[in-house]
């Protein structure tokens, strides 16, 4: 699947509903918005003078008798693009149909694309030989990704080798994150435990409300994680975090070739690593990019920004109860007001195919006694 890098402006028509596409949508910068939304839970001690992170929702006063009914909620982050990669903006709640195991669901919550973003930049930074190279590529965040973020958005920076480190905790100051990237000089260990890093990061995000994503910049190679790929995927399916992957194996191999030294890098199974990155993104509703040259990085990050800025957040409570411990397949469709499939046309009236990006399913919890 190719990267979303199209620049051509199009128009979208659904029955009598006009949904104009954002011009240069994959590369457009989002306007700076006002301060909004509560920040995500802090991972480290924050400056007491800075804006405080939110606490969990306050509990209501306890009555004499309380009956608690746990209702499972499934949250989806959805992006829709044309076949040429143009983002389809302006969609409303009634333009989405969600099928859970083929059964239509009622969407209970809907957030448009201007909702605040909570994002973790997760960077592989090992001494295997390419950690510094990856950190160098991470500097493209300043010129390509950060300008598209709004003041209300929250960003954190994490790195990983054999363990995961929080370099910059959640902040709305993007310069602080950029300084954290610039201060990455000498990688420590040679391991790259990407499975563990992903699961630790997802766990930190579990209490964050709203749109939340991980942008993973890595080779995709896992060395000595405590978790297997199957265990990792099972937990990712239970989360509501969208993962966007930028696989850097090809870029590093080309960089090393041009500089006369590959060494043991040729023996590494980059094909398997890329397949793992594709799986992370595809199953969580994200996308994976695999640039071959460093010159492609700004455009790739602009595409990442387009996805992040144009996500729709949908929630529903499965009609089945979804506490059977099984994997449930999800399909998200775009529909016109009359329930027919959404029709997309360009400015010349030519019908366009489109793609909906959303997680493919979720791992339902296992109901216990009394559920």
Q: Predicted regions: what is each one?
A:
Residues 27-371:
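Scaffold/interface architecture of coatomer-like assemblies
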Residues 5, 21-24, 49:
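Intrinsically disordered, low-complexity segments enriched in Ser/Pro/Gly/Ala and basic residues
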Residues 1-7:
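N-terminal secretory signal peptides that target proteins for export/translocation
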């Amino acid at each position: 699947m190719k990267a979303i890098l199209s620049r051509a402006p199009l128009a979208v028509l659904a029955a009598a509903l006009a949904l104009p596409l954002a011009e240069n949508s994959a590369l457009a910068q989002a306007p700076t918005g006002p301060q909004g939304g509560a920040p995500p839970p802090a991972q480290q001690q924050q400056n007491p003078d800075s804006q405080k992170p939110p606490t969990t929702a306050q509990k209501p006063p306890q009555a004499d008798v309380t009956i608690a009914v746990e209702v499972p909620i499934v949250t989806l982050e959805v992006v829709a693009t044309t076949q040429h990669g143009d983002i389809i903006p302006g969609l409303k709640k009634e333009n989405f149909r969600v099928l859970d195991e083929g059964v239509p669901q009622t969407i209970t919550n809907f957030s448009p694309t201007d909702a605040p973003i909570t994002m973790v930049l997760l960077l592989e930074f090992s001494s295997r030989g390419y950690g510094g190279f990856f950190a160098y590529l991470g500097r493209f965040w300043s010129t390509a990704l950060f300008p598209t973020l709004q003041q209300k958005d929250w960003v954190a920076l994490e790195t990983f080798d054999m363990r995961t480190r929080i370099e910059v905790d959640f902040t709305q100051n993007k310069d602080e994150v950029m300084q954290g990237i610039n201060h990455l000089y000498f990688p420590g260990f040679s391991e790259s435990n990407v499975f563990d890093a992903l699961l630790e990061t997802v766990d930190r995000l579990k209490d964050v409300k709203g749109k939340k994503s991980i942008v993973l910049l890595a080779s995709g190679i896992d060395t000595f994680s405590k978790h297997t790929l199957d265990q990792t995927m099972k937990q990712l399916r239970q989360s509501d975090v969208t993962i966007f992957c930028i696989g850097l194996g090809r870029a590093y191999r080309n960089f090393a070739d041009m500089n006369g030294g590959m060494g043991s890098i040729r023996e590494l199974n980059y094909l398997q690593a890329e397949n793992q990155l594709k799986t992370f993104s595809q199953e969580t509703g994200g996308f994976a990019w695999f640039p071959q040259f460093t010159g492609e990085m700004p455009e790739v990050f602009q595409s990442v920004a387009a996805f992040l800025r144009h996500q729709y957040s949908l929630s529903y409570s499965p009609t089945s109860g979804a506490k059977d411990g099984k994997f449930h397949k999800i399909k998200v469709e775009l529909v016109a007001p009359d329930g027919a499939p959404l029709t997309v046309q360009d400015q010349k009236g030519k019908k366009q195919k489109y793609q909906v990006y959303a997680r493919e399913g979720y791992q339902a919890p296992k109901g216990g006694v009394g559920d």
